[in-house]
Amino acid sequence: MSVKHFIQITKPGIIFGNVLSVAGGFFLASKGHVDFALFLAVVIGTSLVVASGCVFNNCIDRDIDIKMERTKNRVMVQGGMSLTLALVYATLLGVAGFSLLYVQANPLSAFCALIGFIVYVGFYSLWLKRKSVHGTLVGSLSGAMPPVIGYCAVSNSFDLAAVTLLVMFSLWQMPHSFAIAIFRFKDYSAANIPVLPVARGILAAKKQIVLYVLAFVLATLMLTLGGYAGLGYLAVAAAMGLYWLYMAWGGYKAEDDSKWARKVFGFSILTVTALSVMMGVDSQTAADVLMTYAR
């Protein structure tokens, strides 16, 4: 056991991705008036909560991970850390993260983090991932919480913008996850995980990817239409979203499903990164947007 194991078991890549969306939500609510001490507390607090969830997930999934090529070398599978130590580590990370959000931000942001944590660890990891084709849908709620946490940490209000962020990022999770399940089809089949491509076929997953990307594109526009983001954000959201939709539609004539799914997955990362950046740098009040339209 080494320091490396303590880092690896938290899934740093997932933490980094969540930090980007936290920042997007935070700067969207800040509207150019950034409290950097609060920002640091929210980023660290959310990262600790996400890390805690990932460690718990590693503990829960160790019987599944050993059957999958991409996860067979994880810390818990390889015996790099005892179950007891991992559970204690996960608990300490969670307590630290929730406490930091509650004390340094506000109870609302801590509550949003708690909801995401319960959905991911309790409903998704412990239950639905193994039992239901709808596990991805339920799990998407946890993946959508980080930008909401960032937004609510500043606004201290669960308003239309917070709802829009929750819907946007939940919708984004679906085609992103289905694409992974397609190019990792053998892994999920070997572990008997009922993701949509395995349970109902790749064609069914392709149809769902197109529908969810379309819904995502429409949802992204609501930040500008609702008066929370500017026209620069709108242009980027529309361009990225429509190209992602075009790419998703191409799945119907793809000769290599795995190659196509990897492209859809890769562009999903670019899309959510671009939107997180743009909603942070091009946030506006409703009055600002109305004045822009009126000119």
Curated annotation (Swiss-Prot):
E.C. designation(s): 2.5.1.141
Major location category of this protein: membrane
Pathway the protein acts in: Porphyrin-containing compound metabolism; heme O biosynthesis; heme O from protoheme: step 1/1
Superkingdom of the organism of origin: Bacteria
PANTHER family found in the cross-reference section: PROTOHEME IX FARNESYLTRANSFERASE, MITOCHONDRIAL
Note: Carbon 2 of the heme B porphyrin ring is defined according to the Fischer nomenclature.
Protein name: Protoheme IX farnesyltransferase 2
Species for this entry: Pseudomonas putida (strain W619)
The encoding gene: cyoE2
